[in-house]
Amino acid sequence: MWRLVPLKLGRLSRALKLAALGSLLVLMLLHSPSLLASWQRNELADRRFLQLNKCPACFGTSWCRRFLNGQVGFETWGRLRLLDFLNVKNVYFAQYGEPREGGRRRVVLKRLGSQRELAQLDQSICKRATGRPRCDLLQAMPRTEFARLNGDVRLLTPEAVEGWSDLVHCPSQRLLDRLVRRYAETKDSGSFLLRNLKDSERMQLLLTLAFNPEPLVLQSFPSDEGWPFAKYLGACGRMVAVNYVGEELWSYFNAPWEKRVDLAWQLMEIAEQLTNNDFEFALYLLDVSFDNFAVGPRDGKVIIVDAENVLVADKRLIRQNKPENWDVWYESKFDDCDKEACLSFSKEILCARVTVDHNYYAVCQNLLSRHATWRGTSGGLLHDPPSEIAKDGRLEALLDECTNPKKRYGRFQAAKELRGYLAQLSHNVR
């Protein structure tokens, strides 16, 4: 009798799967004309699909020529609009190629928000401009705060945008000048003066800063200069293009030990670079999970591919203003929650201290240690070490101290030693 129960449950499970598959096939047949049309047509050359008609309530136009000329095309399954309901994050994979280059390369396309978030953005703009939830965005944008810097305003100042997003939670003038000078959605980039931007470009800059500042992070801290972010390529309407890096870090969760050690070392090096660098900008990662990093297939390099939640603190400004306890080392508190990718932090403290261990804590807790949980797994990237390393105990001790320190300022020392130990292990196994 007991053996029949799992058998029946198994049959029920298979029946449900077949029913779901059958429903999907029926939907595909019902939509077959539009399905065939979407398969054959390059929708990335369609102005309305790109939502170019919503500019200047958009992210830019620097890549419009490439899109509209058909140089960017969805990869196979990306052509099926019927599957868009599964693509909650509105992230697509596509192929891009210049005719004169003769080849094509993979790129990632992002709308920078879900359909719901984008609809809420439109409603917010309309309500602020007209008091109604629907309107002509082209007419409404000049009547919102995104147009406050139009005209003869010389600089983008902290007072104008402070708190709009994580990137500018506590902006310095030096950071904002960098954002404007490196803004890629204008032909006249290179100047920190706002008056060198068109009114439409200023509104696009401010809207991006408020809605999802990831493009501005990638532009201001570019991969070409050694920053560990994906390369920004351009935008058209509400579609942003970035370079495809490789498979997400999660796909390496069960990779050979040697590979995982190398990736862990790189992650700790990223934490160090973003915390301490010659530019004296501290870039704190507020959302750290396996999905937010990717690994290059050729060079094996770890890159951050989701930079929406990055807080930038200007250490020079902190030293200059000397807020209360500015020179006291800040230790992040361990958060033993039952959810995935938990982090505990205070944005106000991150903005007011020169020495902060947040990035070490985030990487150790959410990616490397036994406390890291993701998609139903636990143990972190460094799970199941070889017997000799497990027996030695040093790795586990460093990871525990980096995650939940028992000594005062223990995480700072543990992170330093962990970087050295991982470097030693990775060199030994190469």
From Swiss-Prot:
The keyword Protease does not apply. It holds the Pfam family PIP49_C. It comes from the Eukaryota. The keyword Methyltransferase does not apply. InterPro entries: DIPK2A/B (IPR020519), FAM69_kinase_dom (IPR022049). It is found in: Golgi apparatus; Cytoplasmic vesicle, COPI-coated vesicle; Secreted. Keywords: Cytoplasmic vesicle, Golgi apparatus, Secreted, Signal. Expressed in heart, brain, liver, spleen, kidney, lung, thymus, testis, ovary and muscle. GO terms for cellular component: COPI vesicle coat; COPI-coated vesicle; extracellular region; extracellular space; Golgi membrane. One of its GO terms (biological process) is regulation of phosphatidylinositol 3-kinase/protein kinase B signal transduction. Residues 1-35 form the signal peptide. May play a role in cardiomyocyte proliferation through paracrine signaling and activation of the PI3-kinase signaling cascade. Belongs to the DIPK family. This is Divergent protein kinase domain 2A. The gene is Dipk2a.
